[in-house]
Every structure is written in C-alpha cells, then in structure tokens.
Design a protein with these regions (language model features):
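A solvent-exposed, acidic/Ser-Thr-rich amphipathic alpha-helical stretch
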Residues: 58-154
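Short, surface-exposed coil-to-beta transition loops
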Residues: 130-132, 168-174
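Short beta-strand edge/turn micro-motifs at domain boundaries
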Residues: 2-19, 145-149, 171-202
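Short acidic, glycine/proline-rich loop/turn micro-motifs
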Residues: 74-76, 158-163
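Low-complexity, intrinsically disordered terminal/linker segments enriched in charged
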Residues: 160-170, 181, 191-271
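Short, low-complexity N-terminal intrinsically disordered segments enriched in polar/charged residues
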Residues: 1-59, 63-67
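Short beta-strand segments enriched in hydrophobic/aromatic residues
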Residues: 52, 65, 152-154, 191-194
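Active-site rim elements
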Residues: 34, 124, 162-166
C-alpha cells in the first residue's frame, strides 16, 4: 500500500506509475511516418478483436502474426499463467485446441436441442468480445518495431458440457510487440494479463480470490510451454508486469513482452 503520510510507494508500485513522455522533435516527414505507424498498429489490434469475436483465430494467426521463421520461432502468447512459446505452440493452443473445444460444444448443443449436427451452428451459445481502449503505442527509433498497451473490459460466454451456459466478465491489460515484415507491422509477442474476472451472477461484495483450479481463465489456458506466474493479479493493474511501453531505440529480447523480457526470465534464463 502507499503510505499517504509520506506519499511514498514501494518500488514495485512505482515501476508502473504512468509517465508522460513528450513527442520527440522530428521532421515533418518523420512525424507523418510515426503517426502512420501508430495508426497501423492500432488498426491491427482492433482487427484482431473482431477476428477473435468471430472465432476467426486461424485467420488472425495467418494474417496478423509474424510469419518469417526468425520471428515465428520466438513468437509468444502470454497470460497470468505462463507463455506459449513459438508460433507452432501458439497455433496448438490458440487455434487447434480452441477448435476442438468448439466442436465438442457443437455436439452438446445439437444433442440438447435435438437437431442434426451441422457445422453452421459452430459457436452457438458462445460469445467472446474484448474491445480495446486507452492505447499507448511507441514506435522504435529505428522504425522496425512497435510496442503497445491497451485496457479491455471483456466478456466470454461458453457452453458447458452439461448444456448450460457460463458467462465471464474480464478486466484485462493487453501488451504487445510488433515487428515489420515486408514493410508491415505484424504481431510478435502478446501478453493478456487478467486483473480480475467474475462469473456472471457473482455478487460484487463476494470474495474476489479465485483458486487457480476454479479459475475459468487458468483452466482455459491449458498447459503452456513455459508455465509460470507472469502477472500477479493480487495487485490488479498495479503489478509491475507487463509494464507500460516507454520510448526505446530498437527491440531486443530483454525489452520485449516475450518471455525473455520478463523480470524472472531476463537474459534467457529458462527460455
């Protein structure tokens, strides 16, 4: 907690206090390029939200993520519970396991409704939407990468095995790295850090601690390549990871949102 008598906060809290950085002094041409790059990154992340909402995860991975082997090998998807490391690992969990879940839900839905199984009904009873807000995007000084943070108050509705529905509210801090491939920014690393989540119908004065085995988001994240405590939501948004992006010269593993940039793994320990 902050000691309000001295206005002194512990170091971990100070690390994530928002800071203002004035725009750099640039030529007109460089300023136009920087603003164009920022809007390109914002558009990419907005499109990703709509692809997710429409269950177009394979399309997202094919169109919006890195594809060059040097980048694909170190692409990552992180959450509170660890990282999927390497694009093939992201594919395995984010696309393949998700599609298997949707097919199982389709079978349940059709059995409960007494209708023939039809893939046109894939996703019936399910909904996922995480709109993005309050973006901060930094373009590297070398122009070859970008970093961004967004906040999302999202919701997820799923069909359970017994045919009943479950609903979830999610409060998320989303951070990502982007690199240029063929002159276009592509998603390289993403961390979806959950600050809070509540099952629909939960009383707002109820105990907010969720045992990991009962945490729908932890269960859904499966078995990541690197299991670890990436973001401790005991402190909600004030946890110092993932930090807000600051101005930087060039993207390195150590300053990235990939596992190599996490304070516990900095320098490649365990990666």
């Amino acid at each position: 907690m902050i000691d309000w008598t001295t206005k002194k906060a512990p170091a971990w809290f100070e690390h994530n206090v928002p800071k203002h950085y004035p725009l750099p002094r640039l030529s007109d041409a460089d300023m136009i390029q920087m603003v164009t790059d920022i809007e390109e990154v914002r558009d990419l992340m907005s499109l990703r939200s709509y692809y997710q909402a429409a269950d177009l995860r394979q399309k997202e991975l094919d169109e919006l993520w890195v594809s060059e082997p040097i980048h694909a090998a170190k692409a990552s998807y992180g959450s509170n519970y660890g990282y999927y490391y390497g694009k093939s690992e992201v594919q395995r969990w984010y696309v393949d396991e998700f599609q298997a879940k949707r097919k199982a839900q389709l079978k349940t839905y059709c059995e409960k409704q007494g209708v023939p199984e039809d893939e046109k009904l894939l996703g019936a009873g399910c909904m996922y939407m995480c709109p993005l807000s309050t973006s901060i995007v930094r373009i590297a000084k070398d122009g070859q990468s970008a970093k961004g943070i967004w906040y999302s108050i999202g919701q997820q509705s799923d069909l359970k095995e017994d045919g009943t529905a479950s609903g979830l509210w999610m409060y998320l801090k989303i951070c990502a790295d982007f690199v240029k491939e063929d002159g276009k920014f592509k998603l390289y690393h993403i961390v979806v850090a959950n600050d809070q989540n509540y099952q629909a119908g939960t009383k707002y004065d109820a105990d907010t601690y969720i045992d990991p085995k009962d945490d729908a988001l932890a269960v859904e994240f499966g078995n990541p390549t690197i299991p670890m405590n990436v973001h401790d939501n005991t402190y909600n948004w004030a946890d110092n990871y993932p930090p807000m992006p600051e101005p930087y010269d060039t993207l390195t593993p150590e300053n990235s949102y990939g596992p190599e940039g996490h304070p516990m793994l900095k320098g490649g320990k365990g990666v």
